[in-house]
Regions:
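Histidine/acidic-residue-rich catalytic or RNA/ligand-binding cores of hydrolases
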Residues: 82-89, 157-161, 186-192, 217-218
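Generic structural signal for well-ordered alpha-helices
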Residues: 4, 34, 60-61, 102-109, ...
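Acidic-and-aromatic substrate-binding clefts and catalytic sites of carbohydrate-active enzymes
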Residues: 24-29, 48-58, 124-131, 153-159, ...
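Active-site beta->alpha N-cap acidic-glycine motif
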Residues: 1-84, 89-90, 96, 107-114, ...
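C-terminal domain-boundary segment and adjacent tail
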Residues: 2-12, 40, 54, 185-218
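Non-membrane alpha-helical structural segments and their capping/turn regions in soluble enzymes
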Residues: 95-103, 167, 185-189
Length: 218
């Protein structure tokens, strides 16, 4: 299995840029994070599943009300790993075939179009692991695969202090992954603290639609 990395093309102007990406897998919305992003005007890319969209209309309305801050991208239909062979990853059964990968990607895309009118450009599968052939399938469907370079919250399982430390340590060009669908987990508090620390350092926050992510890449 492949776990692709993603970083921004550096701009040599002495400024530090990072991209915050947040996965909304299923379940609820962590308003500690969402409300802070709005209040502090921190741009972020939110990867949503069709399952999450179905139950989080209020949070979606907040995202849609701030197009200057939030880019909405594709996290799949049912949070099934986009892997075209029958394996289990972190206890989650993978899609298992090319047809099932297409369904996961397209189901997510169609849900985003229906809910927002926007066409997603990026796809991140559940667990962020793929095969080289499933990545080729995703590209063939017109989507780029969104890797990352800093794992902020360890799948939302880390404590607040460790999550904050990971995020605050991000360097120029890093793409951070964390979660925005676990309001009861300590990690969410760490996401907030880590992002505020980056902001205090004068870091510029980018989204995946930034020109720094122009192809070539995934």
């Amino acid at each position: 299995l492949v776990e692709p990395s993603l970083k921004m093309t550096p701009q040599h102007d002495g400024k530090v840029r990072v991209a915050m990406t947040l996965d909304a897998c299923m379940g609820k919305t962590d308003h500690r994070i969402l409300d802070m992003l709005v209040k502090e005007k921190i741009p972020a890319t939110i990867f949503v599943t069709a399952r999450w969209l179905k139950h989080n209309g209020e949070a979606l309305a907040v995202l849609m009300a701030h197009p200057d801050l939030f880019e909405i991208e594709n996290h799949g239909e049912n949070h099934v790993p986009a892997v075209d062979k029958p394996v289990s990853i972190y206890g989650i059964a993978a899609a298992g075939s090319e047809i099932a990968v297409v369904q996961e990607v397209e189901g997510g895309r169609q849900a985003i179009v229906a809910a927002t009118g926007l066409q997603p450009q990026w796809f991140r599968g559940a667990t962020a692991k793929y095969t080289t052939s499933s990545m080729a399938t995703i590209n063939r469907l017109g989507m780029r695969v969104a890797g990352y370079s800093v794992n902020g919250d360890g799948g939302s399982l880390l404590g607040a202090a460790m999550t904050a430390k990971h995020i605050a340590a991000a360097k120029n060009g890093d793409v951070i992954i964390s979660h925005i669908n676990q309001p009861t987990h300590e990690a969410g508090e760490g996401v907030v603290k880590g992002l505020l620390a980056l902001k205090a350092r004068g870091v510029i926050f980018a989204r995946l639609d930034d020109p720094s992510f122009a192809p070539p890449g995934n």
